[in-house]
Amino acid sequence: MTSQIRRAAASIPANIAEGQGRDHTKEFLNHLSIARGSLTELETHLILSDRIGLLNEVEVETLLALTDRISRMLSRLRKSLEKRVES
């Protein structure tokens, strides 16, 4: 479980960076979508870690608050980029 959490967590900024380095906004949007999927996967692993006793509830709540904040940032970035594509 620990390796899955690390992999999902590392995938989020990696996909954002890769998307930003692409030539087209649509490609960036695609990578943001992948990053969002990795974030959702991370949230799931955190919840499961609490249920099976790898992390305690306080740790998981703190981490889930951070994932929620990241999710909102990704959504705002996505909306901003979608406006560029529509223009």
Locate the predicted segments by residue.
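Short, C-terminally biased terminal segments at protein or domain edges
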Residues: 1-87
